């Protein structure tokens, strides 16, 4: 709508609420870990399942360059069953090329690793290959796993850009630089994948 000039300001967001029924069903399907764990131990436990989450996030998008703007969404792309990790690696390269951003210009990769050993294979592969020399961070130990958790990641990325700092609790390795371009990559149990490129405002 913004690109087609049908609106100037749009409120968008995502909501997911965890109920007792949905928790029981998803637990039976093996989406959650069988035993309670601390969220801070999510990436230490090398087994199946994640931790359940819920959340809501809303953003005011505008086509106007204003001083109070926090960040700019450069690009967004979704994929349904894109294939194996190598196929997703190619998708990421094409996505960055489309938006005239090189890998070296990506200051931070925000990943949707959720602690499920099978689910995280694609992240592990990308972390050792295309993202090998780029600082990485995780976020699902803070919000849990849910279908629209990428909205939490987008909020987190915007706050990183606004405050010029990366919280230590999300860093995979210590960072010394302030990110200007953040690439968010998330997938929901291998089915729905998304890429969001967010940057500081150029105004």
Where are these regions (language model features)?
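Terminal domain-initiation and capping elements
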Residues: 3-6, 19-21, 30-32, 36-37, ...
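Conserved beta-ketoacyl condensing-enzyme motif
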Residues: 8-9, 16-19, 101-133, 181-183
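Condensing-enzyme catalytic core mediating Claisen C-C bond formation in acyl metabolism
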Residues: 28-108, 133, 181, 189-190, ...
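Conserved phosphate-binding/catalytic loops in two-lobed NTP-binding clefts
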Residues: 131-145
């Amino acid at each position: 709508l913004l690109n087609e000039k049908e609106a100037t300001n749009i409120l968008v967001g995502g909501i997911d609420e965890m109920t007792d029924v949905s928790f029981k069903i998803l637990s039976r399907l093996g989406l959650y870990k069988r035993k309670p764990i601390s969220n801070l131990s999510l990436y230490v436990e090398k087994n199946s399942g994640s931790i359940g989450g819920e959340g809501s996030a809303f953003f005011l998008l505008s086509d106007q360059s204003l001083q109070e703007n926090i960040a700019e969404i450069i690009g967004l792309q979704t994929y349904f069953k894109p294939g194996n990790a190598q196929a997703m690696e190619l998708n990421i390269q094409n996505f960055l090329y489309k938006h005239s951003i090189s890998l070296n210009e990506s200051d931070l990769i925000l990943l949707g690793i959720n602690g499920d050993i099978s689910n995280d294979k694609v992240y592990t592969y990308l972390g050792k290959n295309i993202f090998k020399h780029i600082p990485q961070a995780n976020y699902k130990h803070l919000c849990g796993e849910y279908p629209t958790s990428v909205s939490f990641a987008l909020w987190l990325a915007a706050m990183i850009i606004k405050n010029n700092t990366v919280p230590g609790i999300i860093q995979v390795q210590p960072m010394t630089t302030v990110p200007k371009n953040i690439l968010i990559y998330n997938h929901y149990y291998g089915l729905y994948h998304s890429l969001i490129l967010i940057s500081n405002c150029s105004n």
